[in-house]
């Protein structure tokens, strides 16, 4: 059997023409098609590689913008044909305060326009047009990747799309199985007295020393005891001035009077922070199950969220937010997610359908995992589909809203 005949057999199996095939044996190109396999040294059980040479003319690439615009227009028309009438959506929002609140959180621009029918229609169509354009661009990009899958740059993009699909699936699983991880955790405070002055102390086992602000030290009348020889600069996430150290002062925790040392530091919004030095010295135990600080067999309950003074929470409420490309907002200090990610944009990283390449080119299907059967009531799914949405969109929205029908409709709108 000659190399040329081998290429013909490959063509019959893969529809790849012989002139686009490059046969490799031991990473060596078989350039002479007239030689037999025996002459080349190929025996039974040997493995051969076929490298496909694809011709990618520049004209289709330049026309990508036009085709993307046409696809976007088709997507928009399909959305408008399948989706509910804008006036129906507007009346549904106005008729249910819970739906309007959900829309206000997820889509403030659309919520603000709900009182004006013409403005609402314009905003809704503009948002649908943007989504259709993004979807068309992604589909066009997927088509280009499918056209030349062996290109190293394309391989990296394919890997990134697969990674993004995994991230999206992980997000959906987290929101479905443990949505509490997206909330904000109340910090641990206990009521104490320092030198007869009552205040709330922040319990932080991650701090090396017990820290007090200069204002609190003045209020407790211990600023006069600050040893400035222990001053300096604290470096961590930023810097802060250390004014000095109070070597010993009395602190009351529960009914216990304990000696404690304080490092007086500027730049802290918290009056008193109980660090690891004080906690270990008195063998304190943070018991989260009981919600208390156990110290010398005495339980001191942590303050509830409603009992924590407002000024102690300002640092966390006014914390800088890190915005992601998909709309998520994460607290820079606490890590709390205060605005859920745009699931539609994240999940569209891997479109479920892409334009098919020519039959003589290998195809790489980049798809998210198929949607599983929903665990939510069929009545809820039916009510959403009656508004013009597909069953898959209804199930995804119910998963994101943890089964809440109004919240799911708010996500879709």
From Swiss-Prot:
Top EC category: hydrolase
Record GO terms (molecular function): aspartic-type endopeptidase activity
Catalytic site positions: 204
A Pfam entry, by short name: Ddi2_HDD
Record organism: Aspergillus terreus (strain NIH 2624 / FGSC A1156)
GO CC terms: cytoplasm
Chain spans, region Disordered: 59-85, 337-379
PROSITE patterns membership: UBA, UBIQUITIN_2
UBA domain location: 375-413
Name of the protein: DNA damage-inducible protein 1
Domain Ubiquitin-like: 1-57
InterPro entries: DDI1_N, Peptidase_aspartic_DDI1-type, Peptidase_aspartic_dom_sf, UBA, UBA-like_sf, Ubiquitin-like_dom, Ubiquitin-like_domsf
Gene3D superfamilies: Acid Proteases (2.40.70.10), DNA helicase RuvA subunit, C-terminal domain (1.10.8.10), Phosphatidylinositol 3-kinase Catalytic Subunit, Chain A, domain 1 (3.10.20.90)
Keywords per UniProt: Aspartyl protease, Cytoplasm, Hydrolase, Protease, Protein transport, Transport
